Amino acid sequence: LKMLQQGGSAIDAAIAAQLMLGLVESQSSGLGGGTFLMHWDAAQKSLTSLDGLAISPQKTTASLTTDVDGSQLPYASMGRGGRSAGVPGTLPLLAKAHAKFGKLAWPALFVPTIEAASKGFPMPAYMHQILSAPTAAKDHADMLALYFDDAQKVKPVGTLIVNPDYAKTLQSIALKGPSAIWADGASTDFLAAVQKGYKPSLMTEEDLKSYPVEEREPLCGPYLRYRVCVMAPPSFGGVVVLQVLQMLAEKSNLGTDFNQPEFAHVFAEAGKLAQADRRRYVADPAFFKVPAKALVN
């Protein structure tokens, strides 16, 4: 809201919000992750879709899904360890979005979060819940120091959390630009984190510095009298949303009251069918021919 009050664009506000989420919801969102962004320019009647999803390191091969004996690793096992981490695209995407649609100066977007990280923010209830899991901070000394007390118990909800390292990182990016996050040595810490322990990553500094943000054609389809546009693959959420909406449109006589068993049943079945399709047909279009338009036709 502060960005809009200062004359900024919706993109300025979105970037400032993302930076703040990296502080107060760091378990779910941050500079080490990936982002999709869709932007509608009402004046130009133009829709832009940017893909900043985390991607596999350049050295990745299919053999990384197998164990030392050649057997297929369990799906749950592949989701743990440094090998499961993708090359982050959030910051490159934010920089590209700002270059295209931002109005305020880049450093201005960082001020609220730098201030909150330096002065402290109250421990959110959801972060507390996540950190309370038995293995949440195991072997992570930095997390223990930041979010836990001397008895290694999660600090109570509402406790003031100060994160000077995040503030320092944001100050560097604000003053020197997005590439500063890797130029100032953060890449060393990031790579050390994903290259140690269980199933280490093959990620390199070159992967981090050469991340390619892609502009993709949005995926659009009809819903009643509307035209709904969503993020195209590799995002699978858009395909699911359009499929569900179009199946519901065929049953529009049922209304939209979730308290009615008939509608609730149709909605649940539509979701099941859409999820089945996305699991079977939707993947990274760089490696797999995705029949996206056919799926929402």
Labelled PLM ranges:
Residues D142, E250-N297:
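Internal maturation/activation junctions in enzymes
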Residues Q243:
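Protein kinase glycine-rich loop
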Residues K2-Q6, A10-A183, T188-A232, F236, ...:
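Noncatalytic scaffold domains of N-terminal-nucleophile
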